[in-house]
């Protein structure tokens, strides 16, 4: 008798474990978030977050999130959860970001802090474990940060991961695995992956150049050399510019007044430029010398690069020039499949309706602008007609006054006679 696979795995104790959700925040309970999220008091002028679904959305309630509300401000807000270590298990960090303000410069990333963080004093120099998410500033910076704190030093990824820079909601996912590999996804599609050791400078290089090795003095690494049998032709050297043979001294040229006449110069058609001997293959060429490498005595492998003793706080510690960014659908779990499913059930469900609403607003705005432009032209034409009528009335009035003055003058002349 064949047993179903799930039942068989269960009997063998091999059934997949349920996902562990360490932190999840969707802001579905109105102002309840204010009890879970703590504002830092490190600076008195930190920007304020408000709960909003923005100017356009797929679902007004489901799409509500934390929105930055003040321009040119630093922001510092965090939420605490039960501490856990990712040692021996996968870590997945996921959230959505929406830059509906068409952001010009500002962060859209999160930071994961250890349990020792004082949330009321969180600031830009507070030590964190991981920083992940988009950062935009002008046309030159549109990247996804993936920064790990390793032995007290913040280490940046060696690759450039481009972030989304439009006005719609996007899903960002970071996966860190116990085999020291990682994956970055945007909108549930992989955009980067690889090895932690290869893509970050956590460790000294495995190999270094042998300090005792040097290129031999007789090593010839010239692939081409001058042909020793080649010589410059006798008629090669010609001046680059010559007097114009067709130029003539003007007839009215006065040498006492104008000085000695000199014809203008022109490009010499026989000028050949600098002579260089032709190149031939170097018979002594040995190739490019490669510096020999040796094992780096400073290198020591670390199988626990990925692991942290504890995570306990998720924070939004960032700067924005133009406010309006909305953060939502935060998730920290140990299950990649669950995170993907959660993303599809949140961002995935509302993204199409969000775009439809934005497209409708854009179309309405376009029609409104066209109508305003049309009204402006009509008013301009009406003003022009009014000015023309006014000018005609003034001309008629002037003609009438002139006629009256002429009649008065004629009457006065008649009386004098």
UniProtKB/Swiss-Prot annotation:
GO terms for biological process: ERAD pathway; protein folding; protein stabilization. GO terms for cellular component: cell surface; cortical granule; cytolytic granule; cytosol; endoplasmic reticulum membrane; extracellular region; sarcoplasmic reticulum lumen. The keyword Isomerase does not apply. Residues 237-270 are annotated as: Interaction with PPIB. Residues 309-417 are annotated as: C-domain. The modification N6-acetyllysine is found at residues 48, 159, 209. An alpha-D-glucoside binds at residues 109, 111, 128, 135, 317. Disulfide bonds join 137-163. Residues 18-197 are annotated as: N-domain. Keywords: Acetylation, Calcium, Chaperone, Cytoplasm, Cytoplasmic vesicle, Disulfide bond, Endoplasmic reticulum, Extracellular matrix, Glycoprotein, Hydroxylation, Lectin, Lysosome, Metal-binding, Repeat, Sarcoplasmic reticulum, Secreted, Signal, Zinc. Calcium-binding chaperone that promotes folding, oligomeric assembly and quality control in the endoplasmic reticulum (ER) via the calreticulin/calnexin cycle. This lectin interacts transiently with almost all of the monoglucosylated glycoproteins that are synthesized in the ER. Interacts with the DNA-binding domain of NR3C1 and mediates its nuclear export. Involved in maternal gene expression regulation. May participate in oocyte maturation via the regulation of calcium homeostasis. This is Calreticulin. It comes from Bos taurus (Bovine).
């Amino acid at each position: 008798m064949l047993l179903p696979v799930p039942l068989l795995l269960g009997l063998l104790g091999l059934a997949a474990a349920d996902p562990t959700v360490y932190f999840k925040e969707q802001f579905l309970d109105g102002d309840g978030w204010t009890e879970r999220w703590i504002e830092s008091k490190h600076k008195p002028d930190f920007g304020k977050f408000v709960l909003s679904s923005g100017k356009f959305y797929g679902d007004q309630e489901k799409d509500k999130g934390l929105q930055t509300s003040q321009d040119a401000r630093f922001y510092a807000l965090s939420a605490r959860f039960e501490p856990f270590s990712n040692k021996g298990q996968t870590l997945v960090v996921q959230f959505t970001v929406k830059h509906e303000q068409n952001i010009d410069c500002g962060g859209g990333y999160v930071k994961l802090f250890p349990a020792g963080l004082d949330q009321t004093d969180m600031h830009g120099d507070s030590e964190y474990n991981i920083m992940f998410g988009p950062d935009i500033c002008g046309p030159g910076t549109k990247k996804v940060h993936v920064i790990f704190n390793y032995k007290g030093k913040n280490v940046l990824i060696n690759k450039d991961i481009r972030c989304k820079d439009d006005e719609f909601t996007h899903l960002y996912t970071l996966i860190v695995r116990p085999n020291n590999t990682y994956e970055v996804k945007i909108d549930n599609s992989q955009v980067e992956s690889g090895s932690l050791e290869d893509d970050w400078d956590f460790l000294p290089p495995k190999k270094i150049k042998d300090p005792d090795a040097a290129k031999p003095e007789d090593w010839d690494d010239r692939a081409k050399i001058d042909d020793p049998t080649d010589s410059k032709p006798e008629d090669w050297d010609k001046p680059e510019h010559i007097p114009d043979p067709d130029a003539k001294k003007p007839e009215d040229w006065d040498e006492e007044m104008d000085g000695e006449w000199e014809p203008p110069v022109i490009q010499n058609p026989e000028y050949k430029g600098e002579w260089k001997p032709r190149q031939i293959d170097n018979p002594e060429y040995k190739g490019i010398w490669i510096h020999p490498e040796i094992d780096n005595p400073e290198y020591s492998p670390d199988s626990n690069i990925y692991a942290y003793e504890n995570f306990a706080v998720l924070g939004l510690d960032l700067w924005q020039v133009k406010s309006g960014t909305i953060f939502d659908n935060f998730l920290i779990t140990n299950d990649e499949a669950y995170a993907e499913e959660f993303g599809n059930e949140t961002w995935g469900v509302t993204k199409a309706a969000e775009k439809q609403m934005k497209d409708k607003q854009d179309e309405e705005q376009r029609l409104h602008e066209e109508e305003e432009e049309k009204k402006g032209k009509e008013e301009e034409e009406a003003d022009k007609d009014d000015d023309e009528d006014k000018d005609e009335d003034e001309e008629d009035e002037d003609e009438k006054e002139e006629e009256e003055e002429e009649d008065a003058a004629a009457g006065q002349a008649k009386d004098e006679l």
